[in-house]
A protein has these predicted regions:
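Short, surface-exposed alpha-helical recognition segments that flank or form part
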Residues: 13-14, 18, 135, 139
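Long, charged, mostly alpha-helical binding arms that flank functional sites
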Residues: 36-191
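Metal-dependent nuclease catalytic cores in nucleic-acid-processing enzymes
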Residues: 19-35
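A short glycine/serine-rich beta->alpha loop
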Residues: 2, 6-17
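Short linear motifs at secondary-structure transitions and domain/linker junctions
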Residues: 16-24, 54-58
């Protein structure tokens, strides 16, 4: 039962250094034994280099353990860093990139927290909301709609770097720096009318 549910696999991440040995021979073996290919897609990963510019290696002593990153900045900052790599390209580990991911996630969290403090338990229909859109609301919804298209296309092509940079640009600049700052006055007006 497990075999039928998991074979063939949807995707196989693969380092470019072992394509010939693992990906090629796995494909040949599976075709010979089952008549089926072992996976639908292969995503080629680059190698991770240390801050010294050399491939991470225990013998070189330039390995940064994921636990060390997670302990200082959290798993999501590490995921954000990893998502910024371009398939097939090598990536250099740099603490400043981890810190940037951490700052972005903090910005995202703070925006979410700010918005959730403004949402009340009242039931409001979509028609009521739609009837109160102003040009700025339509602008941010247009930006969000465009972001959805870009992210869907990037995901379909395993282009996670475009995905994360597009989301970051939207959240940080369009949503937080422009939209939230521009509509804050609405909150203060509603407090005055109470």
């Amino acid at each position: 039962e497990g075999y039928e549910n998991n074979f063939p696999a949807n995707i196989r991440p693969q380092g470019h250094d072992i394509i010939r040995t693992w990906a090629f021979y796995t494909t040949l073996r599976c075709l010979a034994l089952t008549g089926k290919k072992p996976f639908d897609d292969i995503v080629i990963n680059g190698m991770v280099f240390g801050e010294d510019g050399y491939k991470m290696s225990k013998s070189r002593g330039n390995v940064i353990a994921p636990d060390e990153v997670i302990e200082q900045y959290g798993a999501d900052a590490l995921r954000t860093w990893a998502a910024n790599s371009v398939p097939g390209s090598d990536v250099i580990f740099d603490w400043k990139d981890i810190k940037h991911g951490y700052r972005f996630l903090r910005k995202f969290w703070n925006a979410f927290r700010f918005i959730s403090m403004q949402i009340f338990d009242e039931e409001v229909s979509y028609d009521e909301i739609k009837g109160n859109f102003d040009p700025l609301d339509l602008w941010i919804l247009s930006k969000l709609n465009n972001l959805n298209k870009v992210v869907d296309n990037a995901f379909a092509n395993y282009d996670f770097a475009t995905t994360i940079t597009s989301i970051e640009k939207f959240i940080w600049h369009d949503f937080c720096d422009e939209y939230i700052e521009a509509v804050k006055y609405r909150l203060y007006l509603s407090l005055i009318h109470i």
